[in-house]
Structure formats: structure tokens, C-alpha cells
Curated annotation (Swiss-Prot):
InterPro entries: Pentatricopeptide_rpt, PPR/CCM1_RNA-binding, TPR-like_helical_dom_sf. PROSITE patterns: PPR. One of its GO terms (biological process) is response to abscisic acid. This is Pentatricopeptide repeat-containing protein At4g11690. It comes from Arabidopsis thaliana.
Length: 566
């Protein structure tokens, strides 16, 4: 063993005569694969690389040691690192610690990277901003919010920070939904003497949009301009997307116009975002104008672009045009993906062309794609809409054979079909089956069942289900309340209907026009014109104008009451 160790040192003595990079390259060549390293040989090599400022190569060498690619009978990775951190001079040791930390970050070893960071600080060294930011990015991405927040606050006085350090933290806060903390960091950033940049403002705008705080996002955007920061295409895109997703569509399109007026060209993501909203609004023609504009400007389309347009056309039932877009995407070298196929299958199911939908399903399989749970749910729904429960059952059987378990959505589609076809016994049986499989019925499942019982006038059954869902912490929504109110009104039970209306008001849920009309009608039949008038006042307060027929009902009820009182 001593002879091998001596041979290693002799070889290294010759290698150090070469420039550091040449020596490193030689050691990584096939001729040196049987080379037996020692503590000393690695130490010499690292010192050589660090002295030449070849930090990435030093890191590469350590990564090979950590991963076991460089192994030796003379050391383990832990014994080697202990030797290195104990034996090097102060200047080399500082650089060495940073390389060790970076290496463990790159190898995704959270505990060891933090351990060597702590050791570095305990030895009196102050990690530079590059090293700390690299570690901080890893810690933020690999830990819970509370863990990395504590890590930063415990160490911020022990390291060199820069504006990028705060950028990493602000992004982490926004992704964790901790918007207030991100604004605290913005203040702290300035206290450290730094100025926020466009990236930080863009991150904050995106975070506010995702949290639904759209006014804050807009304020930040205009604050940027006052500070002399020029919004880039990403800044505009996240704000436009946020405005759309928060229902402020008009302002979203205005921001898109402003972007171009300010000389900022939309990128692929901006165009996709705008086209998506236009398609959702049923403005597919306008979406294609945007599509033509992006192509004229030389912006390359991607699969999302085409899927967006195909989805818009399918929603408008323009399936022949959707097929033409598929042909165009293929000619542009973009192959349809599962989303493309699911969109088309849904479109053809929507117009009752199940044969074409099944043909598309076969086509996607022939192209090496696998139908997903979504694919099968679309097909099951398509068969159910046509009243073909045996076809739906075949789809369920096929999905199970392919190892795809029916989901809550699958069962709810089937339950809805049987409930609407007046087969409540089968609908309830399916609900019990899904519960046996561990699938908990959600508000939509209960909604279709309650609707089925209400249509049949079986209000006792509907009431039992209503109570059951409340007991199971499944909160009834507006649809269920309105369905129950209509059911009780048809039964002539104004007391129960009004009781549910009161519950809705307490939960800040809104009765619909039909609920108001049926309740007023029942109250008028019971000659309770004053209660009916109070409901009309509630209608007006909630922004619903009572129709002429409702006002006529009350007028007749009042006349009847007046006549009977005589």
C-alpha cells in the first residue's frame, strides 16, 4: 500500500509541472482510471486548481469524489474532506469551503451543504454572495417556508448579501403565498443599501396576481415606472395574465395594448396568454388575428399555441376548422400531444359524434400516446349524454384494463346519467360503490343526487342527503341550496324553503331568480303577500330586478287578501 501511495505522489510531482488545467485533463483521461488517489494527491490537485482560479474544475473534482467516481483504498469522501479543511492555509481554506458547499448543493445534499456552511462560518469565514445565493436557492427550493425563513434570518448577518439574495427570498415568499413577508423583504432590501430591480418587481407582481391581490400588482407596476425601472416583456405578461385570471379582462387587453405602445414586443407567452383569453371569450376570430401577428413578427408557435386555438374552435363547435389547425401544426413540425387529442375528442363528443371521438382515441394510441383518466372521462361523459350507458360501461371497463382507476369525476358522470334517467336506485348504488373504493363524494356528486330526488319530488331523500353532506363537512353550494328551495316550493312547503333561504344569507350565498320566483309564488298561494313583498325587496337589494310576472303575482295576492278580509 505504501508503494502505491509513493507512486501516486511521484506521478503528481510530474503533473504539477503542467498548467493546472492540463494536469486536471490528464487525470480525467482513460490512462489514469486505475490511478490510486490519496489525501495528499487530491489536496495538491485542488490547491493547483484553486490557485489558478479554476473553481468549476475544483468543484468537478470534488463532485467525482462525493459521487464515488473517484474512489481509493486510501480514503473515504468524509475523511478526505476532513483532511482538506484541517490541512489547508486560511486563504485556500476559504475557497475550499465554498467549493465543498457548491459541490454538495449540486449533488442535492441539503444537510451536508448546510453542515459545511455552518462549519465555514464557525471557523470565522464570511461566505461570499455567490456561494450563499447558490446555497440559498437550494435551501428555499428544498425546505418548508418556516425552515428556510429561519435559515436566512439566522445567517444574514454572517454572509455577504446582494440584491440577488433578496430576489431569491422574495420569489420563495411569493411561491409560498407569503406576500406580506415578500413586502417586508422589499423594505429590508433598501435598508441594506440595495435598489430593487425589474426582476424583483416582476416577481412581486406575479405573486400578487396569483394571490388575487390585483390592485397591489397594478400599484407595483406603476411604482416601477416612477423609480425609472423599465418593465420588460415578462413584467407585462405576468400582469396581463393576472388581470385575465382575476376577471379584469378589459384591463388585461388594455395592458396588452400599452405594452406595444411602450415599444415592448410581446413574446410567445404573452401571445399565448392573450389568445387563450380571446378563445375563452368566444372570440376565436380575434385570436387568429393575434396568431397571424405573432407569425408575422417571427415569433415561433409552440404546442400550447395550437392547443389554445384548437380548444377555442372546439368550444365553438367548428370541428372542421380545428382539424385544419391540427394539419397546420403538423406541417410546422409540431406533433399533437395528449391535450390536443383530449380537446378534439371532447369537441366531437360534444356534438354527438362518438364514432369520430373513438377514432381519435385509436389514433392517439397508434402514435404511442396513452389515453389518460381525462380521456376516458370525456368518452364516458359523451356516451352518457347520448343515453348510451352500455357504451359508457365499456369505456370504464377499458380504462380499468389499462390500469386506470375510475375517479370521483367518473362516478359523478355516471351517477348524474342515472339520476337524470329517473333511475335513482342505480345512482345511489354507484355512490355506495365509490365510497367502498375510498372515493369520498364531493359537492358535485351530492348536487346531482339531490337534483335527482328533487325532480322526482322525493324531498325526504333529498333532505337526508343534504344533512349527510353537512355532517361529512362537505359544504352545500349555491346550486344545491337553490335546487332544494325549488324542490320545497314545488312541494308547497314555504316554511322549509324560507329556512334554507335564511341559511344561504347567513353563508353569503345568493339565491337565483328561479328560487325567488318559486318562493314568491308559494307565499302568494298561501296568501302571505307581506312575506312575498319582503322577498321582492331582497331581490332588488341583491341586484335582481323582479319581472312583471312576479309583480303581478304579488298584486293579485294582495287583491285576494283584501277581498277575503271583507
Amino acid at each position: 500500500m505504501a508503494a502505491k501511495s509513493q507512486k501516486t505522489l511521484v506521478l503528481l510531482a510530474n503533473l504539477i509541472k503542467f498548467p493546472p488545467l492540463k494536469a486536471f485533463s490528464l487525470l480525467n483521461s482513460p490512462n489514469f482510471h486505475e490511478f490510486q488517489h490519496t489525501h495528499e494527491s487530491i489536496s495538491i490537485l485542488l490547491r493547483l486548481l484553486l490557485s489558478g482560479n479554476l473553481f468549476s474544475h475544483a468543484q468537478s473534482l470534488l463532485l467525482q469524489v462525493i459521487s464515488g467516481k473517484i474512489h481509493s483504498q486510501f480514503f473515504t469522501s468524509s475523511s478526505l474532506l476532513h483532511y482538506l479543511t484541517e490541512s489547508e492555509t486560511s486563504k485556500t481554506k476559504f475557497r475550499l469551503y465554498e467549493v465543498i458547499i457548491n459541490s454538495y448543493v449540486q449533488s442535492q445534499s441539503l444537510n451536508l451543504s448546510i453542515s459545511y456552511f455552518n462549519e465555514m462560518v464557525d471557523n470565522g469565514f464570511v461566505p461570499g454572495s455567490n456561494c450563499f445565493n447558490y446555497l440559498l436557492t437550494f435551501v428555499v427550493g428544498s425546505s418548508s417556508f418556516n425552515q428556510w425563513w429561519s435559515f436566512f434570518n439566522e445567517n444574514k448577518s454572517k454572509v455577504v448579501l446582494d440584491v440577488y439574495s433578496f430576489g431569491i427570498l422574495i420569489k420563495g415568499c411569493c411561491e409560498a403565498g407569503e406576500i406580506e413577508k415578500s413586502f417586508d423583504l422589499l423594505i429590508e432590501l433598501t435598508e441594506f443599501g440595495f435598489s430593487p430591480n425589474v426582476v424583483i418587481y416582476t416577481t412581486l407582481i406575479d405573486g400578487c396576481c396569483k394571490k388575487g391581490e390585483i390592485e397591489k400588482a397594478k400599484d407595483l407596476f406603476f411604482e416601477m415606472g416612477k423609480l425609472g425601472l423599465v418593465a420588460n416583456e415578462r413584467t407585462y405578461t405576468v400582469l396581463i395574465n393576472g388581470l385575465f385570471k382575476n376577471g379584469v379582462k378589459k384591463q388585461g387587453f388594455e395592458m396588452y395594448e400599452k405594452m406595444q405602445e411602450d415599444g415592448v414586443f410581446p413574446n410567445l407567452y404573452t401571445y399565448n396568454c392573450v389568445m387563450n383569453q380571446l378563445c375563452k371569450d368566444g372570440r376565436t376570430k380575434d385570436a387568429f388575428q393575434v396568431f397571424d401577428e405573432m407569425r408575422e413578427r417571427g415569433v415561433s408557435c409552440n404546442i400550447v399555441t395550437y392547443n389554445t386555438l384548437i380548444g377555442g374552435l372546439c368550444r365553438e363547435m367548428k370541428l372542421n376548422e380545428a382539424n385544419k389547425v391540427v394539419d397546420q401544426m403538423k406541417s410546422d413540425g409540431i406533433n399533437p400531444n395528449l391535450i390536443t387529442y383530449n380537446t378534439l375528442i371532447d369537441g366531437f363528443c360534444g356534438v354527438g359524434k362518438l364514432g369520430k371521438a373513438l377514432s381519435l382515441c385509436r389514433d392517439l394510441k397508434s402514435r404511442g400516446l396513452s389515453p389518460s383518466l381525462v380521456t376516458y372521462n370525456i368518452l364516458v361523459s359523451g356516451f352518457c349524454r347520448k343515453g348510451d350507458t352500455s357504451g359508457a360501461a365499456k369505456m370504464v371497463k377499458e380504462m380499468e384494463e389499462r390500469g386506470i382507476k375510475p375517479s370521483k369525476v367518473t362516478y359523478t358522470i355516471l351517477i348524474d346519467t342515472f339520476a337524470r334517467s329517473d333511475n335513482m336506485e342505480k345512482a345511489i348504488q354507484l355512490r355506495l360503490s365509490m365510497e367502498e373504493l375510498g372515493l369520498v363524494p364531493d359537492v358535485h356528486t351530492y348536487s346531482v343526487l339531490i337534483h335527482g330526488f328533487c325532480i322526482k319530488g322525493q324531498m325526504n331523500e333529498a333532505s337526508r342527503l343534504f344533512k349527510s353532506m353537512v355532517e361529512k363537512n362537505c359544504e352545500p353550494n349555491e346550486v344545491i341550496y337553490n335546487t332544494m328551495i325549488l324542490g320545497y316550493c314545488k312541494e308547497g312547503s314555504s316554511y322549509r324553503a324560507l329556512k334554507l333561504l335564511k341559511e344561504m344569507e347567513e353563508k353569503e350565498l345568493a339565491p337565483n331568480v328561479a328560487s325567488y320566483r318559486y318562493m314568491i309564488e308559494v307565499l302568494c298561494k298561501e296568501r302571505k303577500s307581506k312575506e312575498a313583498e319582503r322577498l321582492v325587496e331582497k331581490m332588488i337589494d341583491s341586484g335582481i330586478d323582479p319581472s312583471t310576472s312576479i309583480l303581478s303575482l304579488i298584486s293579485r295576492a294582495k287583491n285576494d287578501s283584501h277581498v277575503s278580509s271583507k
